[in-house]
């Protein structure tokens, strides 16, 4: 999966967040956890899009961006999957995570760490 392939999945998550926001009533007493999770999901989504934009300017960020974006997508999807109906979602609407697993594997993370040791942290603008 390259960076432009992440975009449709991030768009799918954005749609799920918006659908969940429309479904919930906004009652802090009854839906505090869900609203909290949605606010962090929205922040994580923005961070993922920001790092992908950074890769366009600095390809040295590609490997860390792949890990970060895969982790964001997986984390948000898992939160939705545990209580999909609470968020007004169906399990079939959630992203398929299989294509992201290589970026989250111990081998990928280890290679990323080794790259940091060998080359230092990639500089960004």
Regions found by a protein language model. Name each.
Residues 1-125:
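Flavin-dependent oxidoreductase catalytic core characteristic
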